[in-house]
């Protein structure tokens, strides 16, 4: 890009050509880095000042016919590139804006679905009163059943205690009968011993009787032998007596002896028979007595055995009844414990479902609140984009094409400042229109910032700690942007002051080119430039000071 400077303090004029590349200044955080904007707008004041200055040098403009047309073509191509980039960036912004709108519609649809789900959950949460009544009714019925089972259990326990008392009585009677049986068995043993002794005595007496009978038989035999011997002797004596008449008569002596022995034998036999009869009678009586006692003992033992077996059967029956009652009680306890465990599990499940429902409802409410916050943030972002788009449309209504700065210098060396390169639209327009554009843009920025701050204040009420941190971060980012803007303006001011000191006077602002670029669809690439000088730097300083004051106020906010 070429620029020309004019110095009226020298007698001769000299053309000074300065080549400079277009500068890019990105002020918005949401545009692509390749975007460059500029708005070379020409005001009526600039036109008047340029007419005044160009009237003196109109005679010299005919000498610039030899200007390099390639530079003009380069400027036109640069302007085309810039316009193409602006168009592409606008299309990109439109696409992003459409995507944001689609996202907002999608979030609205999801919001409606979540509201419907929340309404259903609230209805479900309000309905469980009837379900609670049903559960309470079932719990009451189960408690009544439990109380009935408890009463039955108490009755069974009382019956069990009664049977245990009866069992204890029967056990006492059984022990008494066992003692009586032991006594009877002891007496039976005694009787058996006596019977055995009697049997032994009888056997002994029988043996003695046999021995006595043998002795009697032996004595009879001996007596018979003696009698036969005596008879033979008597006969021999008679014979001898007959033979010998003079021999004495011994028959009388023998008869006496025989009579004595017979008396003695009869007496012994009679005494033995009497003793035997008396002993036999005694033994017979004793045996009869023992037999009666044994029979009575046997009868008593059999009766005791019968009673013992009967009592044993009764005890077994009582034990069976007791076991059956214990099993029934155990079954009832197990059944009741199972029912109680089932009811407890059901209650735990219901409580768990209630907790899950509450947690799910809380989660849905949190998601709904998050979606509301996202929606609010998107609404704020959409409002900010709308404000930015409106400001962009307002700026584009004043946009131009480019600027060609021309002029002549004296033949002597000139230390003039080079032409301004293409800068951002906001910066160039603020310099070209210090009275209108700066105030207008600042008002729009303040309105946008006030809208954003009010929306952030509402978000801060909903999301206290986290949103406050985000606000602080965003304010710091905005402060950084403001500092960058102030730094750039400060640098430009320093450059101007340095150039003004080199020239030794207050210079007017250099002219800006206004170019009109036709649409690329028509394929036209013509560019027309008109150079005009701006007002003096003194008219721009109050606007810059006012913008700095507003930025300081914004930082304080």
UniProtKB/Swiss-Prot annotation:
> Cellular location of this protein?
Cell projection, Axon; Cytoplasm, Cytoskeleton
Region described as Tail, subdomain A:
393-437
List every stretch annotated Tail, subdomain B (acidic).
438-557
Region Linker 1, annotated ranges: 122-134
Q: Which is one Pfam family of this protein?
A: Filament
UniProt region (Coil 2A), positions on chain: 249-267
InterPro entries linked to this entry: IF_conserved, IF_rod_dom, Intermed_filament_DNA-bd, Intermediate_filament
Q: Where is this region: Disordered?
A: 452-557
Q: Which residues lie within the region annotated Coil 1B?
A: 135-230
The segment annotated Coil 1A runs over 90-121
Ranges where the record places region Linker 2: 268-276
Region (Tail) residue spans = 393-557
- Keyword presence, Acetylation: yes
What superkingdom does the record give? Eukaryota
Q: Where is the IF rod domain?
A: 86-396
Region (Linker 12), start-end ranges: 231-248
In residue numbers, the region (Head) covers 2-89
Stretches of Acidic residues bias are at 465-538
Tell me yes or no: is Protein biosynthesis among this UniProt entry's keywords. no
Q: What is the stated purpose of this protein?
A: Neurofilaments usually contain three intermediate filament proteins: NEFL, NEFM, and NEFH which are involved in the maintenance of neuronal caliber. May additionally cooperate with other neuronal intermediate filament proteins to form neuronal filamentous networks.
Q: What else is known?
A: NF-L is the most abundant of the three neurofilament proteins and, as the other nonepithelial intermediate filament proteins, it can form homomeric 10-nm filaments.
| Subunit (UniProt) | Forms homodimers (in vitro).
Identification of the protein by name = Neurofilament light polypeptide
Q: Which organism is it from?
A: Xenopus tropicalis
């Amino acid at each position: 890009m070429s620029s020309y400077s004019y110095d009226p303090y020298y007698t001769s004029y000299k053309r000074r050509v300065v080549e400079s590349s277009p500068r890019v200044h990105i002020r918005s955080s949401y545009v692509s880095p390749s975007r460059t904007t500029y708005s070379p707008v020409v005001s009526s004041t600039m036109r008047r000042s340029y007419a005044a200055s160009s009237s003196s040098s109109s005679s010299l403009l005919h000498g610039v016919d030899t200007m390099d047309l390639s530079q003009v073509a380069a400027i036109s191509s640069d302007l085309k590139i810039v316009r193409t980039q602006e168009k592409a960036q606008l299309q990109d912004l439109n696409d992003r804006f459409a995507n944001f709108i689609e996202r907002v519609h999608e979030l609205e649809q999801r919001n409606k679905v979540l509201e419907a789900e929340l309404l259903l959950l609230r209805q479900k949460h309000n309905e469980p009163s009837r379900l609670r009544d049903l559960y309470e009714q079932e719990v009451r019925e189960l408690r009544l059943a439990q109380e009935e089972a408890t009463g039955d259990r108490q009755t069974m326990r009382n019956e069990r205690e009664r049977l245990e008392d009866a069992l204890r009585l029967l056990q006492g009677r059984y022990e008494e009968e066992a003692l009586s049986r032991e006594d009877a068995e002891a007496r039976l043993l005694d009787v058996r011993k006596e019977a055995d002794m009697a049997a032994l005595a009888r056997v002994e007496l029988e043996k003695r009787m046999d021995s006595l009978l043998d002795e009697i038989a032996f004595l009879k035999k001996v007596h018979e032998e003696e009698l036969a011997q005596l008879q033979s002797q008597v006969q021999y004596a008679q014979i001898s007596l007959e033979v010998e008449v003079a021999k004495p008569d011994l028959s009388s002596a023998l008869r006496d002896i025989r009579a004595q022995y017979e008396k003695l034998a009869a007496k012994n036999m009679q005494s033995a028979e009497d003793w035997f009869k008396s002993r036999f009678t005694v033994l017979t009586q004793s045996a009869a007595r023992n037999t009666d006692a044994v029979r009575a003992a046997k009868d008593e033992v059999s009766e005791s055995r019968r009673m013992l077996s009967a009592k044993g059967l009764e005890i077994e029956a009582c034990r069976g009844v007791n076991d059956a009652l214990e099993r029934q009680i155990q079954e009832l306890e197990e059944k009741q414990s199972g029912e109680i465990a089932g009811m407890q599990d059901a209650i735990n499940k219901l409580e768990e479902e209630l907790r899950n429902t509450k947690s799910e409802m809380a989660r849905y409410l949190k998601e709904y609140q998050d979606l509301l916050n996202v929606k609010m943030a998107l609404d704020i972002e959409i409002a900010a984009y709308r404000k930015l788009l409106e400001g962009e449309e307002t700026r584009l209504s004043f946009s131009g094409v480019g600027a060609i700065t021309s002029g002549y210098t004296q033949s002597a060396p000139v230390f003039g400042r080079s032409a301004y390169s293409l800068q951002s639209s906001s910066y160039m327009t603020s310099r070209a229109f210090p009275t209108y554009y700066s105030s207008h843009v600042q008002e729009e920025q303040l309105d946008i910032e006030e809208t954003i701050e009010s929306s952030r204040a509402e978000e801060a009420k909903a999301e206290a700690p986290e949103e406050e941190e985000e606000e602080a971060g965003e304010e710091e980012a905005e402060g950084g942007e403001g500092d960058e803007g102030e730094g750039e303006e400060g640098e430009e001011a320093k450059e101007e002051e340095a150039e003004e000191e080199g020239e030794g006077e207050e210079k007017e602002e250099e002219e800006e080119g206004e170019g009109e670029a036709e649409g690329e669809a028509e394929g036209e690439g013509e560019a027309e430039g008109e150079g005009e000088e701006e007002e003096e730097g003194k008219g721009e300083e109050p606007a810059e000071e006012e913008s700095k004051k507003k930025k300081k106020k914004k930082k304080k906010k």
